[in-house]
Amino acid sequence: MQTQSLNQTSYVFRTENLNVYYGSNLAVKNVTLDIPARQITAFIGPSGCGKSTILRCFNRTNDLIPGARVEGKLTYHGKDLYAKEVDPVAVRRRIGMVFQRPNPFPKSIYDNVAYGPRVLGMKVDLDEVVETSLKRAALWDEVKDKLKENGQSLSGGQQQRLCIARALAVQPDVILMDEPCSALDPISTRRIEELMKELEEEYTIIIVTHNMQQASRVSDMTAFFSVELVGSNRVGELIEFDRTEVIFNSPTKQATRDYVEGRFG
């Protein structure tokens, strides 16, 4: 495994020897990396290598999985994300998540975006939050005249942008994306990718993707994970982490080169 400190001045997350277990089974081992602020970091690697497992550590949604536990160090803006006094709900407000398949609530477009601020009791102008969030998600012009319609009536690509708007409405610091385009057509995928590049001016974004072309197009940094058999258990590990152009053009690890050139995984 290679761990590499990068010449960046500001890090949102830093992990050190991070291990994730499901019950007694080790799922991912010894992950050490620094996530730079206001850049897009991509996690790539074969199925089962722990990309999504590590992603869920960053907003503590692994806490919701029975038997899951994290060992090692994970800091968010220099503070221990797993300290006893840290409220996981507050963490998830600051660190939003967009899932593999669009999952709008069975509510109006307006109520989908307003849901988070309402639940959190945020003292904001909801009309303004809804409009601003939809504009940032590049959806406003398509839905501004039908905000009362059900969010589930939108196309798949529109639904995913609605989910992004819903995440933005609670004013997060980080956006996690777990295969956000895997269920979308190429045109919708390109729109989401363009949106990500716009959003990185204000937000730190981490994306899990099996699409290496997507990782090379949108990300600034790339982490390559792989998997090894330990007995009968598949254990994920970080192999290499560097600038995206390095990972795709001149990686230092042969396993990385084999993967990005299509000879593995």
From Swiss-Prot:
Cellular component per GO, a single term: plasma membrane
Entries under SUPFAM superfamilies matching the protein: P-loop containing nucleoside triphosphate hydrolases
Enzyme Commission number(s): 7.3.2.1
Domain ABC transporter positions: 13-260
Protein's membrane topology: Peripheral membrane protein
Catalytic activity: phosphate(out) + ATP + H2O = ADP + 2 phosphate(in) + H(+)
GO biological process terms, semicolon-separated: phosphate ion transmembrane transport
Annotated binding of ATP, by residue: G45, P46, S47, G48, C49, G50, K51, S52
Family annotation (InterPro entries): AAA+_ATPase, ABC_transporter-like_ATP-bd, ABC_transporter-like_CS, P-loop_NTPase, PstB-like
Stored PROSITE patterns: ABC_TRANSPORTER_1, ABC_TRANSPORTER_2, PSTB
One GO MF term attached to the UniProt entry: ATP hydrolysis activity
Domain of life of the native organism: Bacteria
Enzyme class: translocase
Localization of this protein: Cell inner membrane
Any Pfam family matching the protein: ABC_tran
Main subcellular location: membrane
Keywords of the record: ATP-binding, Cell inner membrane, Cell membrane, Membrane, Nucleotide-binding, Phosphate transport, Translocase, Transport
Quaternary structure and partners: The complex is composed of two ATP-binding proteins (PstB), two transmembrane proteins (PstC and PstA) and a solute-binding protein (PstS).
PANTHER family assigned: ABC TRANSPORTER I FAMILY MEMBER 17 (PTHR43423:SF1)
Family designation: Belongs to the ABC transporter superfamily. Phosphate importer (TC 3.A.1.7) family.
Biological role: Part of the ABC transporter complex PstSACB involved in phosphate import. Responsible for energy coupling to the transport system.
Name this protein carries in UniProt: Phosphate import ATP-binding protein PstB 2
Natural source organism: Synechococcus sp. (strain JA-2-3B'a(2-13)) (Cyanobacteria bacterium Yellowstone B-Prime)
Gene (UniProt): pstB2
